[in-house]
Every structure is written in structure tokens, then in C-alpha cells.
Amino acid sequence: MALGNHSTITEFLLLGLSADPNIRALLFVLFLGIYLLTIMENLMLLLMIRADSCLHKPMYFFLSHLSFVDLCFSSVIVPKMLENLLSQRKTISVEGCLAQVFFVFVTAGTEACLLSGMAYDRHAAICRPLLYGQIMGKQLYMHLVWGSWGLGFLDALINVLLAVNMVFCEAKIIHHYSYEMPSLLPLSCSDISRSLIALLCSTLLHGLGNFLLVFLSYTRIISTILSISSTSGRSKAFSTCSAHLTAVTLYYGSGLLRHLMPNSGSPIELIFSVQYTVVTPMLNSLIYSLKNKEVKGERSLRDSSHLPQLHKGQARWKRPAFTEGRREPGHPELSIPVTPQPQGACACSALRAAPTALP
């Protein structure tokens, strides 16, 4: 496209959430509280998983990276939004805008891949519990996690390198509170066809592709849970994946509503965007902390004066996820001797000896 006599702009102007100073002050306090809560929740979860050997399992390795991604995603969006709520001049350079777009792509793409990897982990734990330790070996879950980061960075690099070549002329007002690629493309006066193709591929591969992987995993999981005859068995099996299922629903639900809305700056579009970029990172760690029994158990243990001791002699361990006084088809009960633990030892270490225990 010929640029003619258009002057090239070097900064963008954000309209933000509101022009009313009183509303902006109220929103500043609200979003600052949410941001601080997000940081504290995710840091606490990270430190807990790191410090406690009982939580050194594939699921918690995924969860630690998910918490770190949520922490980064929130830190990319919220600080600049808080600055704009207090500032009269809501501008940012083109380079700064593209830097924010890059890290949004990295964190959002990595989170989508991590959620699909966690879905596969839950699929292996529920559908093939006897082989879980062999399926989710250290090499596999390390590859899944670091592969998620690699795909996130690759996706961001491709999209931003194409955006660097775009020229922005005259129109520089963004009807939003943050900088995202769909908001920038209409402002360009150069050819954006390649950027549109790259954005479409990113949406299909990272968004739709990972969603299909999660959907297929949970189709098998639900089928397996429904095949369990006892109500308590079904309840225990479902509880192992309820936190992840809630996080997936929140992520894809809010993301779908956000990206289906036009970038017009309408109140309803801004509400869905705030839900996706500000509220969801805060809720993820809260969901896992409240729904996961081991995380709640570790918090309780830290408040106790001592850890409970195992009874001496031969203890018998029954896999808790499916059986309760009866045998389920395809999931036979196994009784496994547990080695007595010394006082003060982690009670979870005894459970690692049981390969049939649901992770």
C-alpha cells in the first residue's frame, strides 16, 4: 500500500476504562488489590510446591509453571493499566506497545499448552492409574512443560517480527486499556495480510488446537468415571480433576467471550477483557488451593506442631480413587505393604511406594 504523504506516528493513545476521575480512582484501588492478591497467591503456591517434597509430582510441576505464567501474564497487563488510571497522558511508544504484545503472546500461548499437558496428566491418572508412573515419567512431563514455553516464545516471535514491519499513520487511538494485536492491526496503513495470517494460525494452533486436546482428554476421563459403579468412587475420581477442569473452563470461557467481541471499546467488551486478563490469573491459584486436598493438607500440616506417625507393622494401602469395599471392573484392589516411617518423616513418602495410588 502506498503511504503517500502520511506522517508516521511513534506512540499510541489509550482511551482506558473510563474518563471519570472518581471511577478511575475506584478502579485503581480495585485492580491494585486484585493484582497484589494475584502475586501473593501465586508466589505462595510456588514456594509451597518448591519447599515440600510431598508435592514433587508431575501434576504439581505443571501447576508451578501455570502459577508462574499467571504471575507473568498479570504483571504484563496490570501495572501499565494502573499507571494509565492515574495518569492524564495515557500514551506508550510503538516499541513499548510491541513489547507488551510479545509477552502477552508468550504467556497466553504457554498457558494454553500447559493446560492441555495437565489434561493429559489427569487422563493418565484416571484412565490408566496402574501405568501412571510409567506414562508420566520425568522425561515426558519435562518435555511437555518446556515445550509449552518454547511454543509460546516461537508464536510470539513470529507475530511480533511481522508487526515490526507495519507502519502506523495518523490514527493512533486504541479503544482499550491494554495493547493487543487485534487492536493494532486496524491502525496500520501498510499491508497487514501476513500479520493477519500469522494471527489466524496462532489462534487455530494455540487456541483451538489445545482446546481439542483438552476436550479429547476429558471425553475419555468422563467416560472412565461414568463406568465406575460406586458413587463414592466416581466422586473421588472426579475430585482429582475438578480443579483443572474449572481452570480450563474459566480460561477458555473468558477467552472466547473476549475474542468474540469486536474491539470497539464497548462496556461489555471491556468487562469480558478484564475478566480474561485481570481476574482469571487471580482465580487459578485460588481454585487449585481450595479444591486440591494435598495443597490444603500441606497448609494444615504447617500449622500443626508435629506430623502424624504411621502405625508400626504391616499397613495395608487401598487405592482410594475407585474402590470402597468392592472391586471395580478393570481396577482390581491391591494391598501393598508400607514400610514404617520414622517420626517426623513426610507421610506422603509412604504413598509413593504404592503404584496403584491415584496421583
Curated annotation (Swiss-Prot):
Taxonomic superkingdom: Eukaryota
Chain residue ranges for the region called Disordered: 301-338
UniProt entry keywords in alphabetical sequence: Cell membrane, Disulfide bond, G-protein coupled receptor, Glycoprotein, Membrane, Olfaction, Receptor, Sensory transduction, Transducer, Transmembrane, Transmembrane helix
Gene Ontology molecular functions: G protein-coupled receptor activity; olfactory receptor activity
InterPro entries attached to this UniProt entry: GPCR_Rhodpsn, GPCR_Rhodpsn_7TM, Olfact_rcpt
Glycosylation sites: 5
TM ranges: 26-46, 55-75, 100-120, 140-160, 198-217, 238-258, 270-290
Single biological process term from Gene Ontology: signal transduction
Disulfide-linked positions: 97-189
Subcellular location: Cell membrane
Ranges in the topological domain labelled Extracellular: 1-25, 76-99, 161-197, 259-269
Cytoplasmic side: 47-54, 121-139, 218-237, 291-359
One Pfam family linked to the record: 7tm_4
Cellular component per GO, a single term: plasma membrane
Topology in membrane: Multi-pass membrane protein
SUPFAM superfamilies per the UniProt record, alphabetical: Family A G protein-coupled receptor-like (SSF81321)
Stated role: Odorant receptor.
Family of this protein: Belongs to the G-protein coupled receptor 1 family.
The protein's name in its UniProt record: Olfactory receptor 8S1
Gene behind this protein: OR8S1
